[in-house]
Amino acid sequence: MFSHVMVGAADIEKSKKFYDAVLGTLGVGPGVANGTRFFYMTKTGMFAITKPINGAAASSANGGTIGFAAPDIKTVDAFHAAGLAHGGMTCEDPPGVREGAAGKLYLAYLRDPAGNKICALHRMPKT
């Protein structure tokens, strides 16, 4: 459905260190530089961080979340720990299981150094 997702960051180098760490836990290589942007590419899509091209301050979306798929609970926990170790802040509830319309999920939420809300999500098997 999506070709890419891009978020703004005032301190692009700080954000790159954060995303290199958290996305590295998911098997994604370091961000590739292109001007004032860094791109993280996989076979299924692309994530990018950028300084806003209009020169205005970067801001995070109120109510917005970007979710990254994780293959297992251990990876979700590693994603969360890497984020905290690289300038992220925990938000929402601690990492753990949530149940709802989407089924049983193991989730961990963070705010990146620019304030963008992200999460790692593992869909748990139906029992």
Model-derived regions: residue spans:
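Active-site beta-strand termini and strand-to-loop segments that position acidic
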Residues: 39-44, 110-113, 123
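N-terminal beta-strand motif that seeds the catalytic metal site of vicinal oxygen chelate
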Residues: 1-17, 66, 124-127
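Acetyl-CoA-dependent GNAT
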Residues: 51-54, 97, 123-126
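Long, continuous compositionally biased terminal/linker segments
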Residues: 41-85
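Vicinal oxygen chelate
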Residues: 10-14, 68-114
